């Protein structure tokens, strides 16, 4: 009967309910049913902007505070301006939400309002007649205490580690039986369970069992892989899904690149294509930084082969890429066949003639693979000196192949950046018209600007809709000489603090809409790898010219 007695003790545990994200209050109204709307988020209170504020939104606030409805939705800081951040802007509720945090909006702290536009409400004096005392917030801690006590158990767990001592702990069947997440651990009738665990995951086993009691767990960069592995092994589907979601959030937190490489190996071992693609995408977008990291020589040949096959590979230049492959092969002592496969993925036509000439002096691989390099250099020099119409006509070259397409080159030749916090987030710059040496005397002038608000669109002379900002604008100077055989597929790189690239976006015409840096209730998409700060630190445009092979000039 001891487990049953402990279970009833757990049900009787009480405590105080703390403030949590999304909680609301009314301030400076003089009475309980009116005031300036304030909402809690990330450890502080803030206000709500009046943009799109209406009676439906106000009623969500009133009902959450125990009143029947709202009678007025006020703007213009009707009860005085507030303090702190403007938490929400352009709130759009359906009326059934428990908090403004659950309504559509621009997202947390993504507003350009001032406090003279703080939203307020007046609620009906009548309350709903129902009052709730909610002490359930203390239940997880109470359940954890029962597990930590290791008393009154009726389920005995043995944790087996390969060729090492076993670890013993115990649990309570009654509590575990209430949680579907625990059913995979305790499948068969009986009082004993054996868990087989890798040595690296032993430190989180106790956390995993504790989670089956409390249904809450802290997941970090160091624990996410093992918790995902345990959740997968014991069918804790919700924890497994949660850890899978966290991979993209946690990977950018490791500047050493060991974590994405480790998770890539784990994805292959568990045949998880989603995790595999997340790791490969992060490494591709941060390839230049990867080549400078201590982990660079540890990149597996198959992974490097896959990375080099990608056009959306972020690197200063193709020469930098080839030199990095050269260094990688020296440190790994790669086989002749593996080197040739990797060199075959290098886009020699994207290197200018002077770089091609320097390879014989700066590349250790050159003389051990001389025939291959001479073939590739000749192919590149033909690209640089022969009009593409003749290449297509006489050699049958397909100039849409990856070999003839630029990657995401971040050197000043093809790229320019603006800081999101800059007072004047705009740049004017020039690039070559095309990578081919045939165009070395022709340049194109560009203007690149970050437009965080509708007002900034108007200030820079752009026509934006209200749904566009924040966005990036890229325009080509009308004075730049046009060539009907050349097109552009330009991209914008979104950098998080620490300069990791967390997303790459396309330009549709002159504009590229900037996604949210963090997941919000906004209808706007979120960057693939979120920024913990909630803002992108830098935007970098990359110019990518290519031949229009179906141009009428070919006829």
Swiss-Prot record:
Subunit-level organization: Homodimers and homomultimers. The multimers form ring-like structures with a diameter of 30-40 nm. Binds LGALS1 and LGALS3. Binds ITGB1, COL4A1, COL5A1, COL6A1, FN1 and NID. Interacts with the gamma-tubulin ring complex (gamma-TuRC), composed of gamma-tubulin, TUBGCP2, TUBGCP3, TUBGCP4, TUBGCP5 and TUBGCP6. The unglycosylated form interacts with PDE4DIP; this interaction, which is PDE4DIP isoform-specific, may connect a pericentrosomal complex, made of AKAP9, CDK5RAP2, EB1/MAPRE1 and PDE4DIP, to the gamma-tubulin ring complex (gamma-TuRC) to promote microtubule assembly and acetylation.
The BTB domain, residue ranges: 153-221
Domain SRCR: 24-124
Residue ranges occupied by any BACK domain in the UniProt entry: 260-360
Keyword field: Cell adhesion, Disulfide bond, Extracellular matrix, Glycoprotein, Secreted, Signal
Any one biological process term the GO annotation gives: cell adhesion
Annotated glycosylation sites: 69, 125, 362, 398, 550
Disulfide cysteine pairs (residue numbers): 49-113, 62-123, 93-103
Entry-linked Pfam families: BACK, SRCR
Stretch forming the signal peptide: 1-18
UniProt gene name: LGALS3BP
Known role: Promotes integrin-mediated cell adhesion. May stimulate host defense against viruses and tumor cells.
Protein name: Galectin-3-binding protein
A GO CC term attached to the entry: extracellular space
Record InterPro entries: BACK, BTB-POZ/Galectin-3-binding, BTB/POZ_dom, SKP1/BTB/POZ_sf, SRCR, SRCR-like_dom_sf
PROSITE patterns, sorted: BTB (PS50097), SRCR_1 (PS00420), SRCR_2 (PS50287)
